[in-house]
Structures are given as structure tokens and as C-alpha cells.
Design a protein with these regions (language model features):
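C-terminal motif of bacterial Sec signal peptides marking the signal peptidase cleavage site
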Residues: 17-20
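Solvent-exposed N-terminal domain segments of exported/luminal and surface proteins
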Residues: 24-133
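Short, aromatic- and glycine-rich surface loops/edge beta-strands on solvent-exposed regions
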Residues: 129-146, 231-247
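Short, compositionally biased P/S/T/A/G/V-rich stretches that sit at domain boundaries
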Residues: 28-44, 52, 145-172
Length: 268
């Protein structure tokens, strides 16, 4: 029996594509998969994007898409570390000499860099690419030939918009937690909330209630899920608007993943 690996949509918000596994009885042949994550960062009074392109010769991946959320919660372990990159499992592919990213009248380039065991395409601007969340981005990936060459693809996609979450307080044990936030402008977003807490016998955040909702501005965490978070002496929460654009690319697939997070990371 082999493993089928899913790229969790929420983990795009952490600027790394990580791996979770479940069982499958089907052996899949390798397929080219490409990702460009576009993560909002605070930069003075405005924002920049931490843009990272990653391309893999992979098998058994399911592409994350924001327009099919599971609109529910689950409990799972939490770690502040970035987890397992796909680059530790699958070989990187060559997507060309550079990737062009255009926002408005400004054009920036992402260049290949070796990061640990894989090749990632990144900007040479340390602080990131200036933009306003919600802007449309035009991307040109030239592609390359050869056994590990990724197909050329060009597209224009909208980035995730900024949002706010209405203040809330932990409910009484046995009660649900109602959430309200600025709704998205269309159905190509999903909202992800993570309620992190220290489990029994721990003084660090090591458990979480993970919820993914339709981006309509309101939902709730059922009492049976939020109770452990409410009862823990150490708590934190995180929210992310995730927007995707998915398309075929040659014999494989490409996924543009844009996120706006609260708390919003600060640009270097």
C-alpha cells in the first residue's frame, strides 16, 4: 500500500507547502506540480508579498483549492516549526531562468535559489514585493525543457484581500465560539482559523482546533471542539484568508496560493 499525500490548503499561509499523508491503494506516476505562494507582510504603512515558487516532479498529491472548503473543524497536533517540505520527498523541477511577477506598473523577478534540499524561486528584494492585498498579479513562468523541465505558463490572478476579525472572548465551557470577520468579495477564498493551546501536561502550544470556512463573514466553532482551547491556561489564535488559482500546466498542474494572515508577519 502506498501513501497519497495531500497539500493542506491552510499550510500555504505558513509560506511553506507541507505534507500530510493518508492511505491509498493506487500507485500514481509522477506528475509536474508547481506552486507560487504569495504571502502578505506588513511593511511600514503598507504591505509587501513574500513570493516563493516551487516546482516538483511528484506523485500522489492533491492540489489545494480555496473554492471547495470543508466548512468544519478538526482537532490536531500543532507545531511552530515549518514541518516537512515537499522538497525532502520529491525532486525539484526547472521552471526557467526567472519568474516575472507584475503588479500594476511594477515588474519583479523571482530567481532560483537552493534552499535545503530543493530549488525555490524567490525575489532578491529582502523586504518582498510591494503591493496592496486584493491587487491582481500577472505571472510569467518561462518553463524549461528536459526530463526535469516544468511547462511554461502565464496567468493573471487576484490576491487575497485584507480583513479584520471582530473581537471575541473565550466562551464558557460547553458553549460555541461565534466568529465574525470582513467577508470576501467572491467565492474564490476560504477562511482558516487555528486555535492553538497547550495540551495537558505541557507549557507550550502543541495542540490546535483547525477550522476552514466559506468566506461569508460568519461562522462558529462547535462547543465540543473549542472546549479544550477554552480550558487551557495557554492560548493563541490565528486567522488566514486563502485565495487560489489552479490550472493545468503541460502534463501537470499549477497552483497560485495567496494569503492574508492575522497576525500579519512583518517584512524583514
Amino acid at each position: 500500500m502506498t501513501n497519497r499525500r495531500h497539500v493542506p490548503l491552510v499550510l500555504a499561509a505558513a509560506t511553506a507547502v507541507l505534507v500530510a499523508c493518508n492511505n491509498s491503494s493506487t500507485q500514481l506516476t509522477s506528475v509536474p506540480y508547481g506552486f507560487l505562494t504569495f504571502v502578505a507582510q506588513k511593511a511600514g504603512a503598507g504591505y509587501t508579498a513574500n513570493a516563493v515558487g516551487s516546482f516538483y516532479d511528484a506523485s500522489g498529491l492533491s492540489i489545494p483549492t480555496a473554492n471547495a472548503p470543508w466548512d468544519s473543524c478538526r482537532m490536531q497536533a500543532y507545531s511552530a516549526s515549518s514541518g516537512t517540505s515537499l522538497g525532502t520527498i520529491f525532486p525539484s523541477m526547472n521552471a526557467g531562468a526567472s519568474i516575472q511577477v507584475k503588479v500594476g506598473t511594477r515588474t519583479d523577478s523571482l530567481f532560483p535559489q537552493v534552499v535545503n534540499t530543493e530549488t525555490q524561486y524567490k525575489s532578491r528584494i529582502t523586504a518582498g514585493i510591494p503591493y496592496t492585498p486584493g491587487d491582481s498579479v500577472s505571472v510569467v513562468i518561462p518553463g524549461a525543457t528536459g526530463d526535469f523541465g516544468y511547462a511554461a505558463i502565464s496567468f493573471k490572478a487576484k490576491t487575497a484581500e485584507a480583513f479584520t476579525v471582530q473581537p471575541f472572548v473565550p466562551p464558557a465551557v460547553g458553549s460555541r465560539l461565534d466568529l465574525r470577520w470582513t467577508p470576501g468579495q467572491d467565492l474564490n477564498n476560504t477562511m482558516v482559523f487555528s486555535f492553538r493551546y497547550a495540551g495537558a501536561g505541557s507549557d507550550v502550544l502543541n495542540q490546535q482546533v483547525m477550522c476552514q470556512y466559506r468566506d461569508d463573514g460568519a461562522d462558529s466553532v462547535p462547543a465540543k471542539y473549542i472546549a479544550s482551547w477554552v480550558s487551557s491556561p495557554k492560548q493563541a489564535w490565528y486567522a488566514s484568508r486563502v485565495r487560489t488559482w489552479v490550472a493545468p500546466a503541460g502534463k501537470g498542474y499549477f497552483d497560485f496560493i495567496s494569503t492574508f494572515d492575522i497576525p500579519t508577519p512583518t517584512a524583514p
